From Swiss-Prot:
Residues 52-162 form the sHSP domain. Heteropolymer composed of three CRYAA and one CRYAB subunits. Inter-subunit bridging via zinc ions enhances stability, which is crucial as there is no protein turn over in the lens. Can also form homodimers and homotetramers (dimers of dimers) which serve as the building blocks of homooligomers. Within homooligomers, the zinc-binding motif is created from residues of 3 different molecules. His-100 and Glu-102 from one molecule are ligands of the zinc ion, and His-107 and His-154 residues from additional molecules complete the site with tetrahedral coordination geometry. Zn(2+) 3 binds at H154. Belongs to the small heat shock protein (HSP20) family. It comes from Rhea americana. Glycans are attached at S162. Keywords: Acetylation, Cytoplasm, Eye lens protein, Glycoprotein, Metal-binding, Nucleus, Zinc. O-glycosylated; contains N-acetylglucosamine side chains. This is Alpha-crystallin A chain.
Length: 173
């Protein structure tokens, strides 16, 4: 089997389309068979590479959605248990930190740690933010948005009028 060797300064024509495993969450877990195949394997087709985007889809997807009603962050944390995760709001940022100690897997021993920081939009109601972890390892952080045209410093807010039974003393002049 021929292995293509490329110099580090050589830029591939499809550079951003072909993901590098160096920076994904599977770094250090061993090479897979398709990692050793040349970019375009001529045995199948000159334009086909098996599992071209596999490492992108399985390396811990982070998705941020912001629409009119809510702001949502979805993060793949399948290698972490809820006890390994910490989610905090600091000023206008969401900080998500995950760390687990060294444990054995198929390739030896591994420990993982990540730290992600996202800016919260100014119109997110921080008091109503929720965070949940699904059974398949997706962490979902979401918060509703207040009206987009509302400026907290200049917004109109109704003040309730309450009735008291005793009279107010008149100010002396």
């Amino acid at each position: 089997m021929d292995i293509t060797i490329q110099h580090p300064w050589f830029k591939r024509a499809l550079g951003p389309l072909i993901p590098s495993r160096l920076f994904d969450q599977f770094f250090g877990e061993g090479l897979l068979e398709y990692d050793l195949l040349p970019l375009f394997s001529s045995t199948i087709s000159p334009y086909y590479r098996q599992s071209l985007f596999r490492s992108v889809l399985e390396s811990g997807i982070s998705e941020v959605r912001s629409d009119r009603e809510k702001f949502t962050i979805m993060l793949d944390v399948k290698h972490f248990s809820p006890e390994d995760l910490s989610v905090k709001i600091i000023d206008d940022f969401v900080e998500i930190h995950g760390k687990h100690s060294e444990r054995q897997d198929d390739h030896g021993y591994i420990s993982r740690e990540f730290h992600r920081r996202y800016r919260l939009p100014s119109n997110v109601d921080q008091s109503a933010i929720t965070c949940s972890l699904s059974s398949d390892g997706m962490l979902t952080f979401s918060g509703p948005k207040v009206q987009a045209n509302m400026d907290p410093s200049h917004s109109e807010r109704p003040i309730p009028v309450s009735r008291e039974e005793k009279p107010t003393s008149a100010p002396s002049s």
